[in-house]
């Protein structure tokens, strides 16, 4: 409700990707500048949820939720499609390092281990809601326009892979489901696409 997400979905995704890339791999000074810019934007964003509950983008609890949902999804994808045997100690290291970015944005009590992340997500479940707006956004994402004809199939695969990575309870809340056949198509398909993408950015 506070951006041009619906009109420029790819642009919104690109800006988010640039922020994540810069704060993860960029110079400290550049990361700090981006974080301050995002914090300034957050201060201007407020509204009401569908049930009338007020919210602010700068709310520390909301910032923690967004961070944990994002990072746990990244980890789930990494474990499935890149390093299934990644040691728990390395997973914990990722969460510890990523938590610094969340804290700099204003998040509080950010979990810093895989066990703490799992506990946090479980604790948040009673507060989560799926409504018409939630389903609208999910539908928009699943039918997102591709930047080119060649990108249509890889894009569709990636979106279905996202559904496949959801915890069962989250998929049920959103009314999203992949059949066994779809999973057998999506997983090897994403492995193939990922190899091409990795080669293209080397």
Q: Language-model segments: which ranges?
A:
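Mature, function-bearing regions of proteins
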Residues: 1-65, 69-202
């Amino acid at each position: 409700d506070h951006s041009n997400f619906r009109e420029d979905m790819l642009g919104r995704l690109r800006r988010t990707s640039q922020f994540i890339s810069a704060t993860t791999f960029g110079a400290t000074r550049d990361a700090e500048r981006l974080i301050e810019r995002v914090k300034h934007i957050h201060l201007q964003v407020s509204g009401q949820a569908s049930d009338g509950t007020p919210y602010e983008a700068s709310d520390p609890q909301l910032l923690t939720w967004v961070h944990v949902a994002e990072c746990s999804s990244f980890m789930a994808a990494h474990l499935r499609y890149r390093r299934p045997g990644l040691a728990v100690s390395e997973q914990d290291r990722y969460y510890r390092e990523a938590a610094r970015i969340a804290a700099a944005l204003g998040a509080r009590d950010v979990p810093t281990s895989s066990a703490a992340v799992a506990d946090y997500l479980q604790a948040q479940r009673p507060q989560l809601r799926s409504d018409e707006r939630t389903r609208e956004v999910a539908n928009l994402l699943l039918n997102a326009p591709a930047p080119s004809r060649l990108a249509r199939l890889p894009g569709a695969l990636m979106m279905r892979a996202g559904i496949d990575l959801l915890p069962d309870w989250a998929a049920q809340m959103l009314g999203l489901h992949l059949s066994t056949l779809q999973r057998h198509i999506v997983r090897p398909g994403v492995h193939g696409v990922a190899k091409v993408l990795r080669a293209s950015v080397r």
